[in-house]
């Protein structure tokens, strides 16, 4: 086991704080409509330009092990917020930095870290409750567009495009973002289907950066039983190899020899293949496999129908323009099924929905209907250069996540105002214990951090903006884009309540743990053993010398 270095108390916190500051300072320049870009060096290809907080956070790795520990913990805040809400990563980072800074000062002044944490947790819970109470449900397409626009850094065309996509496939519909081959950004609604099963083995991945298997124009083998032996599928595999097209296998399970053979063939490049478990269970699985077969113009290969796997021909396989397999979901885009058959299936499911008395069955049937009839909306992001396309795609992804979050939990005034207004709820808290009271005050100060940063990124003094916004009530706040004090909701400057709430909860959770840290342990750098011994003769004695 390698030797470790340990740092305690003040020295540990100081190092950790320095790491937190380096990461947070790099991330927070991107906050708000007038936030700046960050350029990230890539080991190959052009540098990446981004205004996406989590992309910046993920790139930062510090040389000093102890500073790096602090930076990694704040990176965790950004990643977790991104996973849960899909946006708000920069806000979460700014909040975490503010709580850690104030908390470290309080600990240095001799306060009890555990009581400080209790105060921070109490204040966070009160602020979250206030944010949820202020949330206003999103009803119109225009409001959806506003949320998307703000999250895409004021790009109204992106906001309108996402609102259009949601209108076409419904709020629950599937919307994917791709890079376009042209300079234009466009929206296309493709008939497709998504289900919640992912690839059976990570070896099927074709795009390592996104961790997905992306197969163009594949055949689909839809089999209702388990596949474990290799012999039954050999004829169909050989036919697919000769056709030169990829193959997607949808079956109850693929295991043993069959899975091993598919993986080996994929790795050797002989056959582009991916396997996925069939969605659903029991009778519902059969019905969903039938849906996939109708959508792709294939047949469900079932022993009940007297079709043996050994005798399957290419004509019995489904076809689609594209199949994308992720870790936990699969999307089939543009199946070649007959329109009349798909419509007949949709009518059949609608009839079943009307007949069923079980709420659970009705919900599952509606899900199947949405998958068959709703389709998949694809936003193709275009630009003049690859760098521009990547930067814009980051913003479209953020905007899409923010819009989904807004539909889920409603919207609050943007520009850091919802957090600032939550101060009132936190001020109402009190505690006999002075250290818990100090923890509450830490959150009170931290709630101002995002609006200050947005103002400073716009070239305006943060404290003046905070003072002016606190003089008023409700949705009144600072619009950094126009540098005016206005009713933010009326102007369309809104944030999803879920994003603001998640950012605060994640920041407070990690930052309060940092405040209670008393020791840091990191591995010592390995020392070079020096030059190897030289062969006998001339300069033989140099082997052990240290350079």
Swiss-Prot record:
GO cellular component, one term: cytoplasm
Catalytic activity, reaction form: ATP + H2O + a folded polypeptide = ADP + phosphate + an unfolded polypeptide
Domain of life: Bacteria
Residues noted as binding ATP in the record, renumbered to the chain: 30-33, 51, 87-91, 415, 495
Job of this protein: Together with its co-chaperonin GroES, plays an essential role in assisting protein folding. The GroEL-GroES system forms a nano-cage that allows encapsulation of the non-native substrate proteins and provides a physical environment optimized to promote and accelerate protein folding.
Assembly information from the UniProt record: Forms a cylinder of 14 subunits composed of two heptameric rings stacked back-to-back. Interacts with the co-chaperonin GroES.
Protein family per UniProt: Belongs to the chaperonin (HSP60) family.
Matching HAMAP family: CH60
Protein name as catalogued: Chaperonin GroEL 1
Organism taxonomic ancestry: Bacteria, Pseudomonadati, Pseudomonadota, Alphaproteobacteria, Hyphomicrobiales
């Amino acid at each position: 086991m390698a030797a470790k270095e340990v740092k305690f108390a003040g020295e540990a916190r100081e190092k950790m704080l320095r790491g937190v500051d380096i990461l947070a300072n790099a991330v927070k320049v991107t906050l708000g409509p007038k936030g700046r870009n960050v350029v990230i060096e890539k080991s190959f290809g052009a540098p990446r330009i981004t205004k996406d907080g989590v992309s910046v956070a993920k790139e930062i790795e510090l040389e000093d092990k102890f500073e790096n520990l602090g930076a990694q913990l704040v990176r965790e805040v950004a990643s977790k917020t991104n996973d849960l809400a899909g946006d708000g990563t920069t806000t979460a980072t700014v909040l975490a930095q503010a709580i850690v800074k104030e908390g470290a000062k309080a600990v240095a002044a001799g306060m009890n870290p555990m009581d400080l944490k209790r105060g921070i947790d109490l204040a966070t819970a009160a602020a979250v409750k206030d944010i949820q109470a202020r949330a206003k449900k999103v009803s119109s397409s225009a409001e959806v567009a506003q949320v998307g626009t703000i999250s895409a850094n004021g790009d109204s065309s992106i906001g309108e495009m996402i609102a259009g996509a949601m209108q076409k496939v419904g709020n629950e519909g599937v919307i994917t973002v791709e890079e376009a081959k042209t300079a234009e950004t466009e929206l296309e609604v493709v008939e497709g289907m998504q289900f919640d099963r992912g690839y059976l083995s990570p070896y099927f991945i074709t795009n390592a950066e996104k961790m997905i298997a992306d197969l163009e124009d594949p055949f689909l083998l839809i089999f209702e039983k388990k596949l474990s032996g290799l012999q039954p599928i050999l004829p169909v595999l050989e036919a697919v190899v000769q056709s030169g097209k990829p193959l997607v296998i949808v079956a109850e399970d693929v295991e043993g020899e069959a899975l091993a053979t598919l993986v080996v063939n994929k790795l050797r490049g002989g056959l582009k293949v991916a396997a996925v478990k069939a969605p659903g269970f029991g009778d519902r699985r059969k019905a969903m496999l039938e849906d996939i077969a109708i959508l792709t113009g294939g047949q469900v290969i079932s022993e009940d129908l007297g079709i043996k796997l050994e005798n399957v021909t290419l004509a019995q396989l489904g076809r689609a323009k594209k199949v994308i397999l992720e870790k936990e979901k699969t999307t089939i885009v543009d199946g070649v099924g007959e329109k009349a058959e798909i419509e007949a299936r949709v009518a059949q499911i609608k009839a079943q929905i009307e007949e069923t008395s079980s709420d659970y069955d009705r919900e599952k049937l509606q899900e199947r209907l949405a998958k068959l009839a709703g389709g998949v909306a694809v936003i193709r992001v275009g630009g003049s250069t690859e760098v521009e396309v990547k930067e814009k795609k980051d913003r479209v992804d953020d905007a899409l996540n923010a819009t989904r979050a807004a539909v889920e939990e409603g919207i609050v005034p943007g520009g850091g105002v919802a957090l600032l207004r939550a101060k009132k709820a936190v001020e109402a808290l009190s505690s006999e214990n002075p250290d818990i009271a100090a923890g509450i005050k830490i959150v009170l100060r931290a709630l101002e951090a995002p609006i200050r940063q947005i103002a400073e990124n716009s070239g305006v003094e943060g404290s003046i903006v905070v003072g002016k916004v606190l003089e008023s009530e409700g949705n009144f706040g600072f619009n950094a884009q126009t540098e005016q004090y206005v009713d933010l909701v009326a102007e369309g400057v809104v944030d999803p309540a879920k994003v603001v709430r998640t950012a605060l909860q994640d920041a407070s959770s990690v930052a309060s743990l940092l405040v209670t840290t008393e020791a840091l342990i990191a591995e010592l750098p390995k020392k070079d053993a020096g030059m190897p011994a030289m062969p006998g003769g001339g300069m033989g004695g140099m082997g052990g010398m240290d350079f």
